[in-house]
From Swiss-Prot:
Protein name as catalogued: Tetraacyldisaccharide 4'-kinase
Enzyme type, top EC level: transferase
Role of this protein: Transfers the gamma-phosphate of ATP to the 4'-position of a tetraacyldisaccharide 1-phosphate intermediate (termed DS-1-P) to form tetraacyldisaccharide 1,4'-bis-phosphate (lipid IVA).
GO cellular component terms given for this protein: plasma membrane
Pfam families: LpxK
Family matches, as HAMAP family: LpxK
NCBIfam families associated with the record: lpxK
GO terms, molecular function: ATP binding; tetraacyldisaccharide 4'-kinase activity
Amino acid sequence: MQALVNKIWYQGHPLRWLLLPLSALFAFITAFRRSLFRLGIKSQTTLPVPVIVVGNITVGGSGKTPTVIYLIELLRNQGFNPGVISRGYGAQFQGVKVVTVKDAATDVGDEPAMIVARTGVPMVVGAKRVETAKALLTQFAVDVIICDDGLQHYALGRDIELVVIDGKRGLGNRNLLPAGPLREGEWRLNQVDFVIVNGGPAVANQYEMQLRPCAVLPVSPAVTAEFDSTQPLVAMAGIGHPARFFETLTQQGYQVALSHSFDDHQAYDKRQLCELAASRPLMMTEKDAVKCRDFAQENWWYLAVDAKLSPQFDQQLLSRLRSVAAAKKGKSHGV
């Protein structure tokens, strides 16, 4: 099914035309929903600290999670104390939940588990963004909230919006769901503060981002050996765009004997992956690794990547953030 969807969205498959009436209905529903907030019929909650939303206007992986990790590290280096909220897609909990390094990905979601494992950032997950953000502020002394995904969740007031675009797949056929991959029209890019292009050329008023491999690490915390890069390996990925991961491995010179794609947010078990690896080294993404660490074998590895953005982006974002923070601080003191 996913292969057919990709053909419709990115390769001009004629079934797109049959889906266009449904896309028109989707456009009407989303426009109506936005108008409720614009007209004040539905309220938007403003928080006392700056809120940065990192999202996209397409379905599927675009690089939001590495962007969030980049922002966490950037803000910390500048003296901020950021916290993160997320939906926790596929997680098994009710209400809101604080994410810890001990939490399984099945309990809090793949991306939250990965973000906290990498950074240790204060993080709360929940279906309702406003409720989740308030819980974060109640339980942690954060001065900036980063919302991982949630561009279309207008009930949460935001001060800075970042959209991440896949530089290779772009916006596909530029149709709204289900005929195309768009959650909102291309016009939305003109309203956000920053457009980040992941792994592709950026045009005017956009910022290019590269995901650069930084280490090959064992999935199991108990393993102390280093990876032997001369061995042929089996590659697997359960992310929004697995082909990008496989291409990265090839570009890094690894001998990929077999590659296998899983669905995004796939749940794994030990026997399934042992059969796939067949005693060969198994290489996966960092997002997959957080789901496998409890039953990982000695020859299972993951490729850690770091996002790289320009100093110009850093400067523009920090300038905007400091301006927002000062204004909110002034209001809290009655200035």
